[in-house]
């Protein structure tokens, strides 16, 4: 992929993160990226996610915490408006 594409896609991710959570920084963007990809895989290939969750229960717990944090931040942002 070209550097230009990577920069443009990063801009999209940054704006999405800001709109979703009310703030955007490198850590938040990484969290949103993992959350979005995990959610997409869970919807399109649930057996793969089930297997991953069973194989890596500690990672599953981290993902559950990440999802909870993103949901909380999004709700806080919506309540501010």
Predicted regions and their residues:
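N-terminal acidic leader/helix
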Residues: 2-32
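Charged/polar positions within long, soluble alpha-helices
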Residues: 18-21, 46-54, 75, 79
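Charged, amphipathic alpha-helical oligomerization/scaffolding segments
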Residues: 8-11, 15, 40, 65, ...
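Charged low-complexity stretches with an acidic bias
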Residues: 56-81
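Amphipathic, hydrophobic secondary-structure cores in small proteins
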Residues: 27-35, 39, 45-60, 64
């Amino acid at each position: 992929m070209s550097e230009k594409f990577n920069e443009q896609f990063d801009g999209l991710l940054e704006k999405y993160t800001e709109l979703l959570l009310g703030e955007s920084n490198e850590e938040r963007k990484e969290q949103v990226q993992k959350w979005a990809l995990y959610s997409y895989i869970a919807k399109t290939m649930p057996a793969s996610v089930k297997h991953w969750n069973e194989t890596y229960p500690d990672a599953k717990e981290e993902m559950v915490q990440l999802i909870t944090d993103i949901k909380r931040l999004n709700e806080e942002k919506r309540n501010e408006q």
